[in-house]
Amino acid sequence: MTNIIELPEVLANQIAAGEVVERPASVVKELVENAIDAKSSQITVEIEESGLKMIQVTDNGEGMSHEDLPLSLRRHATSKIKSQSDLFRIRTLGFRGEALPSVASISKITIKTATKEVTHGSLLIATGGEIETLEAISTPTGTKIKVENLFYNTPARLKYMKSLQAELAHIVDVVNRLSLAHPEVAFTLISDGRQLTQTSGTGDLRQAIAGIYGLNTTKKMLAISNADLDFEVSGYVSLPELTRANRNYMTILVNGRYIKNFLLNRAILDGYGSKLMVGRFPIVVIDIQIDPYLADVNVHPTKQEVRISKERELMALISTAISESLKEQDLIPDALENLAKSSTRHFSKPEQTQLPLQSRGLYYDPQKNDFFVKESAVSEKIPETDFYFGAVDNSVKVEKAELLPHSEEVIGPSSVKHASRPQNTFTETDHPNLDLKNRQKLSQMLNRLENEEKSVFPELDYFGQMHGTYLFAQGKDGLFIIDQHAAQERVKYEYYRDKIGEADSSLQQLLVPYLFEFSGSDFINLQEKMALLNEVGIFLEVYGHNTFILREHPIWMKEEEIASGVYEMCDMLLLTNEVSIKTYRAELAIMMSCKRSIKANHSLDDYSARNLLLQLAQCQNPYNCPHGRPVLINFSKADMEKMFRRIQENHTSLRELGKY
């Protein structure tokens, strides 16, 4: 008796489903890709309970004939390739003939389909891969596939499902990527009767980006284009000031297929060069058109891994396209042009820490307990509405009516403020070892900060500043040199650490609420983790499509910091994922103290410098910034006398030291 047997087809399909169908989002991906291959122009995805209860994909594509319908549930049955040579010139998204049989083997599936050549359509119902019903019905041209009770016969897979919100976020991300890959298709995503995503299907990639990431993001995107004999690269990349905390917003498309490729991601970052802050990543949508002979998509059942010939040449093409596009943007003239148009409330201009700046006075406000730049000229003022979009080139400005023709303004411009994400306010040179994603280093930092003891600070007499960076003071122990950024960072850290801890009861109503816009997946993830934000006094309410509204803010957060501060908190929450309230508050205090502190190349007047030293003296630990860098160094009188050789060692001591 032989020990080797051929597995039943249903069991083989269930095994294949383990590779193809990892979660409900995998089902959505496979069904939508089939609809795209069927040349659909409209695709509607409806889900219930994040796809575990029901997934329905409706398209207006070519449909299937009555004879082909049962064959679609047979493993390795496909209409997309017919010979071995076809495998090397694949232009469809699917070709393996595994998706539909795999999905059908672990669910109940209902398919209604019709082609335009016939007067009637077909209905197929199957459970666990076994066909129960196959009959003729009346149905529109196209295909409607309903998947119910997913994983009903594979409970082990259900056990590893995450929360409903997490699974829904994965589905939203899949639909968004496919929408970007195929802007010519109108996509609609509906979850439990609520519309989450809708694109117009006009074929305009910028319009698709606006529908997914929002109009504000689209205004900060630059077009790129490059080509050689083998590749055509096009798409949009964000300005260096518009970044995110992870790579999830970097979308690479090859012949209309979303792929993951580490080397191409690196090429994108190389194109930005030093313009990106460490640990930050741009928003990118790059479409690569390539000869199918140069790309092998038959690597993994999910077809997200692609081997590309001449990959180094493609990397250089992408990097060059991005760097050339950024080089063409003369950001300073554009910013000044927008500043001249200011007609609203003004904020202090954010400085650039790595460039030699013109000296400007920084003053101290004892009532607000904070520093400010004196607004003496129009060029030092930025309008609130242009703070985030001030550097956009005229060629990439997009009108709302142009991008979103079906959208309507719900509220007047004076009833709310549209919050803008903060620009990068500290650089790698400030804290080269700071990485909020490195949980081990961060934990060590937090433990050190928690165990700090009260220190005694010497009495200092301030007398000068050097290079707009270092303060000089004298005391009974000699000369002290203070790093002004590290000093105020320590002051701010202890302020935020204490104030954030009191956030539960100290809230102030906003006269004009703020609106905060996120991508679909981030919007869903934030809803799931909203309790963490509530713990620190941030109460966001759902307000329209992928938008939250903030009606009150914690007292510890200054009014001018609301927009950037809330975005920073949300980014950290998305980045750190699950985190205790205590750790979250400490991380938040560290981050906000760094971003809110004065930087190098910024001159202080005497009064402001003395007040900074006074605040530093009141800190629990005035000697180190939260990241461990020294705040000040000391040269004693004896040290100074040795440097000027007023004190010299005798010959005996020098011989003892081995110098003679």
UniProtKB/Swiss-Prot annotation:
<dbReference type="InterPro" id="IPR013507">
    <property type="entry name" value="DNA_mismatch_S5_2-like"/>
</dbReference>
<protein>
    <recommendedName>
        <fullName>DNA mismatch repair protein MutL</fullName>
    </recommendedName>
</protein>
<dbReference type="InterPro" id="IPR020667">
    <property type="entry name" value="DNA_mismatch_repair_MutL"/>
</dbReference>
<dbReference type="GO" id="GO:0006298">
    <property type="term" value="P:mismatch repair"/>
</dbReference>
<dbReference type="GO" id="GO:0030983">
    <property type="term" value="F:mismatched DNA binding"/>
</dbReference>
<dbReference type="GO" id="GO:0140664">
    <property type="term" value="F:ATP-dependent DNA damage sensor activity"/>
</dbReference>
<dbReference type="InterPro" id="IPR038973">
    <property type="entry name" value="MutL/Mlh/Pms-like"/>
</dbReference>
<dbReference type="InterPro" id="IPR036890">
    <property type="entry name" value="HATPase_C_sf"/>
</dbReference>
<dbReference type="InterPro" id="IPR020568">
    <property type="entry name" value="Ribosomal_Su5_D2-typ_SF"/>
</dbReference>
<dbReference type="Pfam" id="PF13589">
    <property type="entry name" value="HATPase_c_3"/>
</dbReference>
<comment type="similarity">
    <text>Belongs to the DNA mismatch repair MutL/HexB family.</text>
</comment>
<dbReference type="InterPro" id="IPR014762">
    <property type="entry name" value="DNA_mismatch_repair_CS"/>
</dbReference>
<dbReference type="GO" id="GO:0032300">
    <property type="term" value="C:mismatch repair complex"/>
</dbReference>
<dbReference type="GO" id="GO:0016887">
    <property type="term" value="F:ATP hydrolysis activity"/>
</dbReference>
<keyword id="KW-0234">DNA repair</keyword>
<dbReference type="InterPro" id="IPR042121">
    <property type="entry name" value="MutL_C_regsub"/>
</dbReference>
<dbReference type="InterPro" id="IPR014721">
    <property type="entry name" value="Ribsml_uS5_D2-typ_fold_subgr"/>
</dbReference>
<dbReference type="InterPro" id="IPR037198">
    <property type="entry name" value="MutL_C_sf"/>
</dbReference>
<dbReference type="Pfam" id="PF01119">
    <property type="entry name" value="DNA_mis_repair"/>
</dbReference>
<dbReference type="InterPro" id="IPR002099">
    <property type="entry name" value="MutL/Mlh/PMS"/>
</dbReference>
<dbReference type="InterPro" id="IPR042120">
    <property type="entry name" value="MutL_C_dimsub"/>
</dbReference>
<dbReference type="Pfam" id="PF08676">
    <property type="entry name" value="MutL_C"/>
</dbReference>
<comment type="function">
    <text>This protein is involved in the repair of mismatches in DNA. It is required for dam-dependent methyl-directed DNA mismatch repair. May act as a 'molecular matchmaker', a protein that promotes the formation of a stable complex between two or more DNA-binding proteins in an ATP-dependent manner without itself being part of a final effector complex.</text>
</comment>
<keyword id="KW-0227">DNA damage</keyword>
<dbReference type="GO" id="GO:0005524">
    <property type="term" value="F:ATP binding"/>
</dbReference>
<dbReference type="InterPro" id="IPR014790">
    <property type="entry name" value="MutL_C"/>
</dbReference>
<feature type="region of interest" description="Disordered">
    <location>
        <begin position="414"/>
        <end position="433"/>
    </location>
</feature>
